Amino acid sequence: MRHYEIVFLVHPDQSEQVPAMVERYTNLITEDGGQVHRLEDWGRRQLAYPINKIHKAHYVLMNIECSDSVLSELNDTFRYNDAIIRNLVIRRKEAVTDVSPIKASEGREDRRSAPQREERNHDNSDEVSEESED
């Protein structure tokens, strides 16, 4: 079995269907003895350029290990599913389990914004307590 990295973009109107789609694809992979090494839901993001007058899409990244027959079945599923706008399959030499740079940058942004929110909350609470003391 070979290792693959798959990214697919789902139409923004179908974002609610993403968990069911991912579950269907992971079942397809694991039923044949394959493995899902990494699965990341990047959420709805801006596209670099419009595709069929669509400016945003829901991104999903999967790193899998599967047979050629499962991969061709996945490609057919992507091709005939109208909800999937684009997909990319890349063969990898080994399994990738690290957090992707996009997901890591989201984590850093969350960590940066959390202290700022806490500072704002503390500042606001100080103002409120000062007002109540008067």
UniProtKB/Swiss-Prot annotation:
InterPro entries: Ribosomal_bS6, Ribosomal_bS6_CS, Ribosomal_bS6_sf, Ribosomal_S6_plastid/chlpt, Transl_elong_EF1B/ribsomal_bS6. One of its GO terms (cellular component) is cytosolic small ribosomal subunit. The keyword rRNA-binding applies. It holds the Pfam family Ribosomal_S6. Residues 97-134 are annotated as: Disordered. Binds together with bS18 to 16S ribosomal RNA. This is Small ribosomal subunit protein bS6. It comes from Marinomonas sp. (strain MWYL1). The lineage of its organism: Bacteria, Pseudomonadati, Pseudomonadota, Gammaproteobacteria, Oceanospirillales.
